[in-house]
Amino acid sequence: MTAQLVARLLLVVGCTVIGLALAGCSPANASQPHIYVALGASDAVGIGAPDPAHDGWVPRFGASLGPDTRVVNLGVSGSTLHQALAEQLGPALDAHPDVVTVWLAVNDLNARVPLDSYAQDLDALLAALEPTHARILVANVPDLTALAPYAGVPADQLSAEVDRWNLVIADTTARHGAVLVDLHAHWQEVADHPEYLSADGFHPSPEGYQRLAAVFSETYADGG
């Protein structure tokens, strides 16, 4: 083998290695998700924001995942978890998601869905999502005592009920290897920032949705 041929071979090998390295660093191959699916109710829809498609927490969180991320928002106002199993799970699986958020609990609690039934539905939902290998974030029930619609409910009774639900959500989430987004722990901020609520005293305002998106983003960045 001549020295000239050896030099050419080394050049080809070197260019190949460099090309592979550059390809591995390109945005197309980076470890950012490309499909984000949101399962939820009116909060996922963005009720309370004048421009839900922009100001809701779902589009804001989706934007934080990277410019190439496609957001599939399956939220339906008024949805319970059982309804989401029938209406949202199928499209979620069809989307082949990289990231999934689930915030479905408050409507169930308000509708007095038996906690055992809710637990079974959450177990079924997360079990169905597991084979996607998506990163799954599940939000719990916030501190409802801070919200005007619950003003007539004894605070200690409501807090105890929320704690029961959150324990089930935390246990089920952990059992399926999903990550808990602890909205309850952050809800004192609502009392400190009344501007986080819309005029109905229940749904977030644009500022509230921005903070919600930040909590999801922080949890995701922490390894969620």
Language-model features: locations:
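Alpha-helical cap/lid subdomain in secreted, periplasmic
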Residues: 67, 86-224
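Short loop/turn segments at beta->alpha junctions
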Residues: 80-81, 114
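Cell-envelope and extracellular/periplasmic
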Residues: 75, 79, 104-105
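Conserved donor sugar-nucleotide recognition element shared by glycan-biosynthetic enzymes
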Residues: 54, 81, 162-165
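Serine-esterase "nucleophile elbow" of acetyl-processing enzymes
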Residues: 25-77, 89-96
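Secretory targeting and sorting signals
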Residues: 2-28
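Conserved Rossmann-like nucleotide-binding pocket used by diverse enzymes
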Residues: 21, 72, 137
